[in-house]
């Protein structure tokens, strides 16, 4: 399914985005709202017939327009209305911790594990994956193009004092960026390093305007590339790059034992829809600029039961081995689901 890119570039400076998915077309700019009503999860419409599901999700699923393909189908099947709160993964998880969402769709496994361990989420499911890429100006002032190590590329950018724009918003992308800086042995600071506290679309625009480097999820970059001059300088694992740039997404219903008023049954229905053959096909067929943005990974003859529990739930002793297994699993997904000519 080809798309017209969401015109989120017009919404510079917008924080959390609150919209009713399925009620607006792909070309309409998102409606901005920096506040979430307390106790918004688990509500029902005034006529008592149409249920409302509050989804807190990362900006990449919203900015790419993927939810415009998924949510209307779910709404029709379940006579429901999906209220989408688009924000960084950290903020989306915090929204759910406060009881203001029924379900989350996010992409930071460590933060997801903490959410599960603390009892706020249940029944996590793998949904899809893509990867991160390091992008920068075409003239590549730091000379990182084609590097095989994201950490080495980051260290080279820092050594060169080349401008790097960080989302700085506790999103899944921001968490990944900080992990790479740590691997590089660099504590980013100084005039060359700019934290802007914005979503991925705004960050790409500002990096483009500043002739800067940034870390982006591949999906948002592909959906935006006609509007910017940045180029991929370091590839992610979808194209043979380092596994540290992996980007898996998971869906987690909020635990009704924590918040009895959440719409748990509808949240479970949503998780079931995303991971069903129908939902997975919609994800697989979703493209921008001729490229597939996300690769579904919920259906398998040999399901990975680790998706349901925290990766290092058994404590620090096996944490490092769990991380390596996670890398191996991601490499397996790439081999199974990503075409060789992608």
Curated annotation (Swiss-Prot):
Residues 1-32 form the signal peptide. PROSITE patterns: TAT. Residues 24-37 have a biased composition (Polar residues). Residues 24-52 are annotated as: Disordered. SUPFAM superfamilies: Periplasmic binding protein-like II. NCBIfam families: TAT_signal_seq. Part of an ABC transporter complex involved in anions import. This is Putative ABC transporter anion-binding protein HVO_1888. It comes from Haloferax volcanii (strain ATCC 29605 / DSM 3757 / JCM 8879 / NBRC 14742 / NCIMB 2012 / VKM B-1768 / DS2). The lineage of its organism: Archaea, Methanobacteriati, Methanobacteriota, Stenosarchaea group, Halobacteria.
